[in-house]
């Protein structure tokens, strides 16, 4: 029995963020990311081969954070820098990925001897069904550096996310983000 998924290396990512710093004492930040890639799914067993499927994998997440400046310095109207920390909530939604358990279930529990000739249709139906998406939510903590020069805003943020089922076998994960934007 052979099940092969193409690698997810080189996935494309699109994201955005907005934050409001008009509230005294804290800032509120919202950001989102959408990532995706295409990959080939191939399956073989003693009975035969499944026709190869080219499938698009997509995942999205949102983060809402309340953050507070820890320390900062500025040259009024020209430049500034600050270190901030924050806490927030997040949501994640990912299309399922073809794995051995899924294929085994679609073949009626017999990976070795089941006829895979119609597995491609059943697998596509399963992967495209919104009910099978992997949805998760959790909370996160983050710390970051912000640099401003006139209207140009740059952030370097480390965020640690606590959410089950986003990464198989892990209940948390860290990310490092670099952002560039314009302050309005």
Give each language-model segment a name.
Residues 1-21:
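Short glycine/proline- and aromatic-enriched beta-strand/turn motifs that initiate or cap beta-hairpins
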